[in-house]
UniProtKB/Swiss-Prot annotation:
Stated name of the protein: S-adenosylmethionine synthase
Pfam families per UniProt: S-AdoMet_synt_C (PF02773), S-AdoMet_synt_M (PF02772), S-AdoMet_synt_N (PF00438)
Residues binding L-methionine, per UniProt: 56, 99, 240, 271
Gene field: metK
Pathway given in the UniProt record: Amino-acid biosynthesis; S-adenosyl-L-methionine biosynthesis; S-adenosyl-L-methionine from L-methionine: step 1/1
Stated role: Catalyzes the formation of S-adenosylmethionine (AdoMet) from methionine and ATP. The overall synthetic reaction is composed of two sequential steps, AdoMet formation and the subsequent tripolyphosphate hydrolysis which occurs prior to release of AdoMet from the enzyme.
Family as reported in the entry's similarity comment: Belongs to the AdoMet synthase family.
Cofactor(s) listed: Mg(2+); K(+)
Cofactor note: Binds 2 divalent ions per subunit. Binds 1 potassium ion per subunit.
Subcellular location: Cytoplasm
BP GO terms, sorted: one-carbon metabolic process; S-adenosylmethionine biosynthetic process
Subunit details: Homotetramer; dimer of dimers.
Length: 384
């Protein structure tokens, strides 16, 4: 059986869609800091010289949307019109309204534990054992490349870099599922007009790619595509408009797991699109960390206004050490997947979300859904 290839991509914090995600989550964090029970659905649109912030919010908090937006754009690095976008001169339009009372009555309960889901939907969580973070390697290293691009841009190691960038990594896998190596690397980065293509290629290769990608997976056959169009001066919101929630595969598993379709950024934890996807990652990671499977994908689904999940299913791709029915029983016993329960389980009603809005929501140990604190109880209950 031949080797097979799998590719994932990532984008930098300066990508237009990620600007939008970060603004939406910055607004969410500012509201949650004052009002942990707020209901927030914040959507952002960015284009040349303009940011529009909209959505539905019900809260006792007051936040300065304009200042939050300008600070977020400024921190990303868009601080001059030469870059195509300027945090201090762009127009900001605020069209936020209130959450529908029809939704509120389905979510709020006299007993908080019976809080209903904020919407119907299906969510997936995934983990595998091919990296230390129990994440797929293609998305992991794609994130690392654009994160490194941001670091060397901000510390001026490569002063000609600009905020917008994209990466893509293709891994080759052996028939047994182990990593054979890296087949191809793509990195496109916005840059100032004065840098030559040869200097850019050398700088990206030596300062970004080589320090990030393990040498053991690189070979003379690995293909590199660095700014393959030859020019990327026009970027950010001038090059493309940006929208919240348009990078859902970048945000999750790079395509290696299925996706329920719901985006994360700008949504408070009552929205199971976000909170249940985090809980599903928590479940899948603990199952793999406990040695109960080498790969695990879990699906949960909800009905609006109903607390209990309408379904839980698990797929281990033939790698389970115990029966999948037992795995589902273990999940039901040790993880509370009701909206209130998972918010409490992962301590989600707090301002932790802006940091998630670039470089992936999963595989980063600073987030509570990455904890592996259920490993021992799962192993004991499974009898292994």
């Amino acid at each position: 059986m031949a080797k097979h290839l799998f590719t994932s991509e990532s984008v930098s914090e300066g990508h237009p869609d990620k600007i939008a995600d970060q603004i939406s989550d910055a607004v969410l964090d500012a509201i949650l800091e004052q009002d942990p029970k707020a209901r927030v659905a914040c959507e952002t649109y960015v284009k040349t010289g303009m940011v529009m912030v909209g959505g539905e919010v019900t809260t006792s908090a007051w936040v300065d949307i304009e200042e939050i937006t300008r600070k977020t754009v400024r921190d990303i690095g868009y601080t001059h019109s030469d870059m195509g976008f300027d945090a201090d001169s762009c127009a900001i339009l605020n069209v936020i309204g209130k959450q529908s009372p029809d939704i509120n009555q389905g979510v709020d309960r006299a007993d908080p534990k019976e809080q209903g889901a904020g919407d119907q939907g299906l969510m997936f969580g995934y983990a595998n054992n091919e990296t230390d973070s129990l994440m797929p390697a293609p998305i992991t290293y794609s994130h690392m490349l654009v994160k490194r691009q941001s670091e060397v841009r901000k510390d001026k190691t490569l002063p000609w870099l600009r905020p917008d960038a994209k990466s893509q990594v293709t891994f080759a896998y052996n028939p047994d599922g182990s990593i054979a190596g890296i087949d191809a690397v793509v990195l496109s980065t916005q840059h100032c007009d004065s840098v030559s293509q040869s200097d850019l290629i050398e700088g990206v290769m030596e300062t970004i790619i080589k320090p990030v990608l393990p040498a053991k997976w690189l070979s003379k056959d690995t293909k590199y595509f660095i700014n393959p169009t030859g020019r990327f001066v026009i970027g950010g919101p001038v090059g493309d408009c940006g929208l919240t929630g348009r990078k859902i595969i970048v945000d999750t598993y790079g395509g290696m797991a299925r996706h329920g379709g719901g985006a994360f950024s700008g949504k408070d934890p009552s929205k199971v699109d976000r909170s249940a996807a985090y809980a599903a990652r928590y479940v899948a990671k603990n199952i793999v960390a406990a040695g109960l499977a080498d790969r695990c994908e879990i699906q949960v689904s909800y009905a609006i206004g109903v607390a209990e999940p309408t379904s839980i299913s698990i797929e281990t791709f033939g790698t389970a050490k115990v029966g999948e029915e037992l795995l589902i029983d273990l999940v039901r016993r040790h993880f509370d997947l009701r909206p209130y329960g998972l918010t409490e389980m992962l301590n989600l009603a707090r301002p932790i979300y802006q940091a998630t809005a670039a470089y992936g929501h999963f595989g980063r140990e600073e987030f509570p859904w990455e904890a592996t604190d259920k490993v021992e109880v799962l192993r004991a209950d499974a009898g292994i």
